[in-house]
A protein has these predicted regions:
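Short functional hotspots at interaction and active-site rims
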Residues: 1-158
């Protein structure tokens, strides 16, 4: 990822070399709880229903506790057959956000911070990008998560 903005001394243009071309796809799936990122997974493909079901089954569901509430947006992969059943089997509840409502989705702010960190780190290879993603995910603190939930209007408790 490349930085979108920068600063330069007055009267001078900012310039930075940026690679151009087509790159392999690297997708990170994750869930945000008040305690921070829970269950992150990186795959070398776009997210489809099969990838998302594998993420739920092998990564997220083992971390869910009875009484947890899983809130999802309306991405088509979130609505494939089997998603609701997996989450309910964990004892959690599944809620979908209204269409076009990123203001109610705290993970949107989390991804924004992660993308800022990735742009700053300027990883240019797949291996470096995976390390940068790990570093960016580790930078998400419980304080960040709690603030994002509060900003989106969700009550949080200690």
């Amino acid at each position: 990822m490349t930085r979108l903005r920068g600063r330069a001394p007055r009267g001078r243009r900012i310039a930075e070399a940026t690679p151009q071309g087509h790159w392999q796809v690297l997708t990170t799936l994750g869930a945000l709880a008040v305690r921070g990122i829970v269950g992150a997974m990186t795959v070398e493909s776009a997210t489809d229903g099969d990838v998302f079901l594998a993420y739920l089954e092998h990564v997220l569901c083992p971390q869910l506790q009875p009484g947890d509430v899983v809130v999802m947006d309306n991405l088509s992969a979130h609505k494939v057959e089997g998603v609701r059943e997996l989450i309910i089997a964990c004892g959690a509840e599944l809620l979908y956000l209204p269409p076009y409502s990123p203001d109610f989705n705290p993970i949107e702010q989390c991804w924004s911070k992660i993308k800022l960190i990735l742009r700053t780190l300027k990883a240019r290879s797949a291996e470096a990008l995976e390390q940068a993603v790990t570093q960016a995910l580790a930078a998400i603190t419980p304080e960040n998560a709690r603030a994002w939930f509060t900003h989106c209007g969700y009550g949080t408790h200690n």
